[in-house]
Amino acid sequence: MSEQLLSELSPVAATSPSPAPAAQQKLNLLDMNRQQLREFFSSMGEKPFRADQVMKWIYHYCCDDFDQMTDINKHLRARLKALAEIRAPEVAEEQRSADGTIKWAIKVGDQQVETVYIPEDDRATLCVSSQVGCALQCTFCSTAQQGFNRNLRVSEIIGQVWRAAKIIGAAKVTGQRPITNVVMMGMGEPLLNLTNVVPAMEIMLDDFGFGLSKRRVTLSTSGVVPALEKLGDMIDVALAISLHAPNDTIRDEIVPINRKYNIETFLSAVRCYLDKSNANKGRVTVEYVMLDHINDGTEHAHQLAACLKYTPCKINLIPWNPFPGAPYGRSSNSRVDRFAKVLMGYEFTTIVRKTRGDDIDAACGQLAGEVIDRTKRTLRKRMNGESIEVKAV
């Protein structure tokens, strides 16, 4: 990571908004949380409760047509159609994994981001992107290799949830579980887009929005400390941290933002967030990708235990998911098991995460959103004699 880029990772940069829409465009109601929607209706001379009615139609019923909102009078519907729209990003491509995971390439302007639906026995998690690309340049992550383009707008973030809910809702007959959890773990660093991420999460939590529990909405960060310090005063959601190293020497190399905000500075900010939060039950989720002979030795496990001694947490060990041109290998099962046993010996709750969707490059660290990656993936599949279901939408 360049010094210039590091200098830009400041509270100002972390909260800078994405470009506003052109003046002639209708207002997209997906860009507004409930308070903003009420202010919009008040500006029209309408009662604030109209905002609640419309919001319920949008998010409870995935409705994007004002004419279908039958408890809104025709005159108001006509005014809404003249002034506003409900426009979620469209799906460009859908891929389905053998394990039930679905990855959507979502069109945002002339670019794409990726959204992943992960069904399990007792839940269904949606992994949502916050930026086109990523500025943090983590060396083990496919998204980082395409660089950073722009922040997503509120409508482009919550629109991923809306679009997925609409698709899954229409497919109930196939037995797919409705979305129960949302994780801000897709493309981008959420804390570098607070201006848009926070209102989107507010809609996820709002009873007139998706009505999710604050413990079921998780924000993951690599350590933009000034923005993390602000987050605790803005919203209370579950927190996960992308640590990935037991010491600053290794983390400086694989997570370059560590050169600006080192591990102790990061963990100190995490503890402050936990002190303010009810959503985390007093502990943070630590994400740790296992890189063969880089950070996966038993000596690293002992160092990690010492590093986290004063930070209440549970630890997710993540098998590294390969992408073309990456300089790493995935840790063997035996090395992961030995690593986990050391941590459990220190009485850390330790989970070895099951890889989901890696056959469609939807697993952790594999999201890229670019056609060039799909070309390389297809070649790799053919060389292995495998097939993949791809559907253009």
UniProtKB/Swiss-Prot annotation:
Keywords of the record: 4Fe-4S, Cytoplasm, Disulfide bond, Iron, Iron-sulfur, Metal-binding, Methyltransferase, rRNA processing, S-adenosyl-L-methionine, Transferase, tRNA processing
Single annotated GO MF: 4 iron, 4 sulfur cluster binding
Top EC class, one word: transferase
GO terms for biological process, alphabetical: rRNA base methylation; tRNA methylation
Ranges of Low complexity composition bias in the record: 10-22
Catalytic residues (positions): E114, C364
Segments for region (Disordered): 1-22
Keyword rRNA processing set for record: yes
Entry binding sites for [4Fe-4S] cluster: C134, C138, C141
Cofactor annotation comment: Binds 1 [4Fe-4S] cluster. The cluster is coordinated with 3 cysteines and an exchangeable S-adenosyl-L-methionine.
Binding site for S-adenosyl-L-methionine: G188, E189, S220, S242, L243, H244, N321
Keyword S-adenosyl-L-methionine: yes
Single GO cellular component term: cytoplasm
Pfam family, one: Radical_SAM
Subcellular location(s) per record: Cytoplasm
Protein EC: 2.1.1.192
Cofactor(s) the protein requires to work: [4Fe-4S] cluster
Xref: InterPro entries: Aldolase_TIM, Methyltransferase_A, RlmN_N, RNA_MTrfase_RlmN, rRNA_lsu_MTrfase_RlmN/Cfr, rSAM
Catalytic reaction list: adenosine(2503) in 23S rRNA + 2 reduced [2Fe-2S]-[ferredoxin] + 2 S-adenosyl-L-methionine = 2-methyladenosine(2503) in 23S rRNA + 5'-deoxyadenosine + L-methionine + 2 oxidized [2Fe-2S]-[ferredoxin] + S-adenosyl-L-homocysteine; adenosine(37) in tRNA + 2 reduced [2Fe-2S]-[ferredoxin] + 2 S-adenosyl-L-methionine = 2-methyladenosine(37) in tRNA + 5'-deoxyadenosine + L-methionine + 2 oxidized [2Fe-2S]-[ferredoxin] + S-adenosyl-L-homocysteine
Main localization of the protein described in the UniProt heading: cytoplasm
Gene3D superfamilies: 1.10.150.530, Aldolase class I
Intrachain S-S bonds: C127-C364
Family: Belongs to the radical SAM superfamily. RlmN family.
Record's miscellaneous remark: Reaction proceeds by a ping-pong mechanism involving intermediate methylation of a conserved cysteine residue.
Function statement: Specifically methylates position 2 of adenine 2503 in 23S rRNA and position 2 of adenine 37 in tRNAs. m2A2503 modification seems to play a crucial role in the proofreading step occurring at the peptidyl transferase center and thus would serve to optimize ribosomal fidelity.
Protein name, UniProt field: Dual-specificity RNA methyltransferase RlmN
Organism of origin: Sodalis glossinidius (strain morsitans)
